[in-house]
Amino acid sequence: MKHLVLGSSGQIGAHLVKYLQDKGEQVTEYDIEYKQWQDLREAYNPTLESYIDTCDIVHFLAFDVGGAKYLEKNQNKHHFITNNMRIMVNTFELLKTYNKPFIFASSQMAEMSYSSYGMLKALGEKITRDLGGLVVKFWNVYGYETNPQKSHVITDFIKMAKYDGVIKMRTDGTESRQFLYADDACEALLILAKKYKKL
């Protein structure tokens, strides 16, 4: 199966590429972090069109996002909102044009109307359903991360413990959270890709 992974350097995407390759799947990576011309914010991109046209399934993981500290700082800023709107509009248009099976990575935050990130993901879910794609809602995916500006809570805790000897929480610590290891998320994505036509 030929997989196109949009957002292939991100928290889930980087793990997904390795996971799929380890399983013997064909993978095309696509991420602005690797090549500047792989910018989903740009409406005209013939290379992306070719990748979408020739793949079997698209994993739409690309989004301008990070952990809580990144969202607190950026999610209500013009650049954050417009970056993600452009990514969605351009990508969904190509998915519609080529009528390609795809999985859209959403978030439990799509239920949180006070969050710009959540509202953007909720819009993405609506468009995905309209185009016949699959929505997967993730919550607190963790695994190895390389970008400290966008890192998530587990990575942050490990770094604090290692370098500071103290873990400073952003909350009072009384709430409970669900966490999903990145490889487990990847396993679920591959199962969905393989069973896509039956769902």
Cite the ranges covered by each PLM segment.
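N-terminal Rossmann NAD(P)H-binding glycine-rich loop of SDR-like oxidoreductase domains
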Residues: 3-23
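SDR active-site strand-loop-helix element
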Residues: 6, 30, 58-64, 102-108, ...
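Hydrophobic "lid"/C-terminal helical patch
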Residues: 16, 59, 189-193
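Adenosine-cofactor binding site in Rossmann-like domains, unifying the SAM/SAH pocket
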Residues: 28-50
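NAD(P)H-binding glycine-rich loop region in Rossmannoid oxidoreductase-like domains
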Residues: 48-83
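Conserved cofactor-binding/catalytic machinery of classical short-chain dehydrogenase/reductase
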Residues: 83-90, 101, 123-124, 181-184
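Conserved Rossmann-fold NAD(P)-dependent oxidoreductase catalytic core, especially the SDR/UDP-sugar
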Residues: 86-118, 134
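NAD(P)-dependent short-chain dehydrogenase/reductase
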Residues: 114-118, 122-193
